[in-house]
Amino acid sequence: MYEIQSFHAGLYDSKNAPVLTGIMRGIEREGLRIDRDGKLAQTPHPVALGSALTHPQITTDFSEALLEFITPPTHRVEDLFKQLYDIQGYTLSKLDDELIWSSSMPCVLNDDATIPVAQYGSSNNGTMKTVYRVGLGHRYGRAMQTVAGLHYNFSLPDAFWSFLHREEYSLLDLQDFKDQKYFALIRNFRRYYWLLVYLFGASPALCGSFIKGREHNLQPLIDERTLHLPYATSLRMGDLGYQSSAQESLYVCYNDKQSYITTLCAAITTPIDEYKAIGLQDEKGEFKQLNTSLLQIENEFYSSIRPKRTAKHGETALSALRNRGVEYIEVRCLDIDPFDPLGVNKPQVRFLDTFLLYCALQDSPDTSPEESANILRNQKTVVTEGRSPKALIESFTKGKIPLKQAGEALIKAMRPVAELLDIAHETEEHTQSLETQLAAILNPELTPSARIISHLSAKKLPYAHYALAQSRHHHETLLAKKPSNNTMQQFEKMAAESLDKQTRLEQKNSGNFSEFLQEYYKQYQMCCDK
């Protein structure tokens, strides 16, 4: 049902191993800073961590209390995890009496006013980042922005693309060929990422304070402090999590690079009444949002995966993509693993590599608006009832299929890809990762979401108490083996350099913010016009 139709046999040749050993990976892991009682930290971003605006590895997301750790791109999985360990270990050593929340769904929250928006200083770039977040708060509420996730960045080496380019006798320029193939990967990813939500969803329950005053269909677990759905996998990926009902009417086309850019640019440059009503500035002239369009910038579009290109200073992400093509893809549908101190583990990464390479090699027809609607329905099904024995996945070509049957068939189709990666890396870890996840398909009780519900029920623990206990445990685990003195010194140097860089940016600030914003948005108009 999901088998790759035209597998390139030459990939099995040992001399072609560099075609796959050159895969580049990176992780972005978010985590809320909390006090020892499990409440959201009200303190500013610690100076010892450097500038959240300019530090390359430690920054903040929506809230001043929502940390984000960014590993540099690396070829080796072992190096990836050492980097993530070092970043988190250094950070924890500088947090004084605070912890990092272990889960995707947030700690006990009070009203929106107690959720501090991230601050990035007085430069135009820093002001823009803060105003964007203020706008998110007005549009969706600040509570939704405290949800944490894990992003996986992935790129295949030029050697791989050159190999395919030759095998397929393509007449395209290599970058154009890569763009075409990355968008094909993305289309297949969107067809099948329901499997990742099922396997790695780890937010089946949440603290009642998160949805206080909002309509919902969640049920109490033990008591009203913890709400859940019996067969849920990832409430983070559902309507109550990091999603936007306002964007449900937005159809973004993934059939080629220009269509993707054009549809997103239109959403950024077309005002809508709902956001006009918020207003652009308050009575004091302070900005309430960057614009009144459906999207302030491309980052506001909530998607499971993004095509990416590293942007230059002052360049929009879409301009970078238009000018230089796809560099890597960013997987955005992963929950924090509350059972692991780092929020992710090596077998999961091996599985993701296999899944993404499968998506790259599998035939990938264009996606229609009807299939896109089908994809979203599958996401909602797996989010709310993925572990139900009655859960059905909608295949756009084959109709409704039991989730267990679809998952088993997809894993089977991925096996040749896992074997390919094992041969290239001289390991069995990719095949083993498939077998581990196949077991979770056949037995839903092995999934992280089921394990969490089982633990809460058995111990009669509220969600917030459980997540706080995990946070304390992970804190002690990571601090027990601090990074080396040399690594600590490197991070201290990075922090100092980032603070200096922010100061220099603020000193050379030119023009007022309104003019800066006007110039910045001209780039989107150029993207629309092309």
From Swiss-Prot:
Its EC number is 6.3.2.2. Pfam families: Glu_cys_ligase. Keywords: ATP-binding, Glutathione biosynthesis, Ligase, Nucleotide-binding. Disulfide bonds: none annotated. One of its GO terms (molecular function) is metal ion binding. One of its GO terms (biological process) is glutathione biosynthetic process. Pathway: Sulfur metabolism; glutathione biosynthesis; glutathione from L-cysteine and L-glutamate: step 1/2. It catalyses: L-cysteine + L-glutamate + ATP = gamma-L-glutamyl-L-cysteine + ADP + phosphate + H(+). The keyword ATP-binding applies. It is an enzyme of class 6 (ligase). It comes from the Bacteria. GO terms for cellular component: cytosol. InterPro entries: Gln_synth/guanido_kin_cat_dom, Glu_cys_ligase, Glut_cys_ligase. NCBIfam families: glu_cys_ligase. Belongs to the glutamate--cysteine ligase type 1 family. Type 1 subfamily. This is Glutamate--cysteine ligase. The gene is gshA.
